[in-house]
Regions:
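Cell-envelope/glycan interface and biosynthesis
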Residues: 1-92, 126, 143-148
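Conserved beta-strand edge residues that scaffold enzyme active sites
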Residues: 94-96
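Low-complexity, Gly/Ser/Thr/Pro-rich intrinsically disordered linker/tail segments
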Residues: 83, 98-148
């Protein structure tokens, strides 16, 4: 909801952004990741595909075509999604430019743990643990590992 609250008005005021946003290609869709037996993030309702172009996906385009499209992709869209804990398929080696996944644990790890040294410490050392949202992510991750 937070993404759309920001993205929709931007797309309404900027035709160049709207061309990448609407009509979107899909969200919840129970299916396997192409070529695997693993469920797609779409199966869990945590992914959205925006407008697609055949040059947006690694299986449909050459690396050069994908790179050219990547360079033209509106940074504003990516920033809005990342600010709200989504990862972007445009940053993957097997690129998927129109794909965004809600993955707060990955975003949190990249924000706070990119420059760690080898000293023993809590896995979340360096994160703003006084923030309630961060605390809830830490708790959820810890509980998941306790139940393995």
């Amino acid at each position: 909801k937070a993404v759309m609250d920001e993205l929709i008005p931007l797309a309404q005021s900027r035709p160049d952004i709207k061309a990448y946003v609407a009509p979107y290609s899909g969200t919840f869709y129970y299916r396997n990741i192409s070529g695997t037996k693993l469920l797609s993030a779409h199966s869990f309702g945590i992914a959205i595909d925006l407008v697609y172009n055949r040059k947006d996906y690694w299986k449909w385009a050459s690396r050069e075509e994908g790179q050219k499209r990547l360079e033209s992709y509106p940074k504003e869209i990516v920033e809005i999604f990342e600010k709200n804990n989504f990862i972007w398929g445009g940053k993957w080696g097997h690129f998927d430019l129109f794909h965004f996944e809600y993955r707060p644990e990955i975003i949190m790890m990249s924000r706070f743990f990119g420059n760690r040294n080898n000293e023993p410490q809590f896995w979340y050392n360096g994160a703003p643990v006084d923030n309630d949202e961060v605390k809830s992510y830490i708790k959820k991750i810890d509980e998941t590992f306790e139940n393995l």
